[in-house]
């Protein structure tokens, strides 16, 4: 049966950890596996890191640059070399590829999000393997950066409604702690629900490699995003991409995250994960219960505080009285308007604002439970 597969490979798997030079044997193995999966009728997308790391090696830089302008320049050098190498390897197997560079802004805008989805779907129909990376050269605003390709791969998996997301990294699976530091760390084979990780006392840490940006914490976060979209997610060893067909065949390799039994629909997945929240609404207990358990829209009467500056139709986070995030949604009022009507009954709003606004602050169709 044909399936849609998204595979993310990180800088630590693509390069030598000491020199930053390309691990050509790993790339050759990866290309062979992906080409074979495509020949078997599967649709395949590769999300590849490595542009900055490869650029550093090409320019003789001893470490990853921290200054944004320099990092963007280095990424431009590395991205061209990375794609040339992929093209050489894939062409030797008669497998066409395409370069797709995305920014967070591309996915935060609804029309561009849909257009990106349409483009990827057309490439897949043509039998092409899209190679996706963040467009580091133009992603200036830190709020509009993915920050790491783990998050990007999870959003792409949701974008194309993939069946599988494989996050290839420098360990064979998720452990209760870093096995390179703590030899008694326990392997985790299957995660049915993300809440299980807290019960297992998983210490993911936050450190990426010298040449990359994503640590294990970002991979767990990416798994949460993907599984909420109904995508089965696997964290496994990047140096052995030949394990991917074995996992698809049912072997227990890596850590497998089961898809959420009630995944978000495409629009709600976009609201929950592709948008960048610009403010916070603090809710009283009645409003928190109404939206989380009763499926209600949010009314002004249930808001106790407004934080941040935002306009109508921007994304905000909702917090309960204990300070826990419980939902996200698109607001029908600006932060200035909400400061004036918070705690008010709906029938009082026209008098307070001087005009008739929306009946709800956030309609339930534009609201996603996250907590």
From Swiss-Prot:
It is found in: Cytoplasm. It catalyses: L-glutamate + ATP = L-glutamyl 5-phosphate + ADP. Residues 278-356 form the PUA domain. Pfam families: AA_kinase, PUA. Disulfide bonds: none annotated. Substrate binds at residues 49, 136, 149. Its main location: cytoplasm. One of its GO terms (biological process) is L-proline biosynthetic process. It comes from the Bacteria. PROSITE patterns: GLUTAMATE_5_KINASE (PS00902), PUA (PS50890). Keywords: Amino-acid biosynthesis, ATP-binding, Cytoplasm, Kinase, Nucleotide-binding, Proline biosynthesis, Transferase. One of its GO terms (molecular function) is glutamate 5-kinase activity. One of its GO terms (cellular component) is cytosol. Its EC number is 2.7.2.11. Pathway: Amino-acid biosynthesis; L-proline biosynthesis; L-glutamate 5-semialdehyde from L-glutamate: step 1/2. ATP binds at residues 8, 169-170, 213-219. Belongs to the glutamate 5-kinase family. Catalyzes the transfer of a phosphate group to glutamate to form L-glutamate 5-phosphate. This is Glutamate 5-kinase. It comes from Acaryochloris marina (strain MBIC 11017). The lineage of its organism: Bacteria, Bacillati, Cyanobacteriota, Cyanophyceae, Acaryochloridales. The gene is proB.
